[in-house]
């Protein structure tokens, strides 16, 4: 059972000065820039939080969905959607080095890009159910655990081998899956049920709360959104933090429709349907 309590100490909530209406796709691990996209995840733009300068990384559809940033903040990995003459959707996985501007095609257009993860030297990719490792730049590729979704089922790839995880059963659909920062736990959302955490082998699955779009704040804390809709429009949403034992704290007020959080140590950033962005500064 969840209970309300203190999870994080909110020191301030600051509105980000955006060049135009946008949604936040990611915050850098160092907290010095945001990646922005549109409300439909089209395009990807870097916004420097210190000076407000922008750098367009992509104008393609889906570029703002499921963006990954390397731990040093230098490499951005994203996918672009395209359509062939039969109107079939394809995904191309790309990376760009923000320092040099060099870009790489990591996976050529495919119908079955299921998941990818980034560490300091490589990108682990699951495509058509098969795992591959792509080095970033000249670094040697490592073997990452990679979470992916295949036909609604939660999969995990460890040491190059992919297996079904789906801890709550095959009859459910899964989304918003991510590894804890220490790589020992899996966070996921079970459609229409709530947010759960389990071990890498799928054991010890436990419900954390009903929040959606969950992300890790640290190894023992998650952040998500509690949104309410009338079947067509979202009319209210707050950002919440929760410990793994289910203690939950609401971080934002009812005056803002706060959605889709992204978190690093000390900062949580969220977007609003009006195209605004805010940063919640927190301590533990």
Identify the residue ranges that each predicted region occupies.
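C-terminal segment of classical bacterial N-terminal signal peptides
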Residues: 1-3
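Sequence signature of WD/YWTD-type beta-propeller architectures
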Residues: 5-284
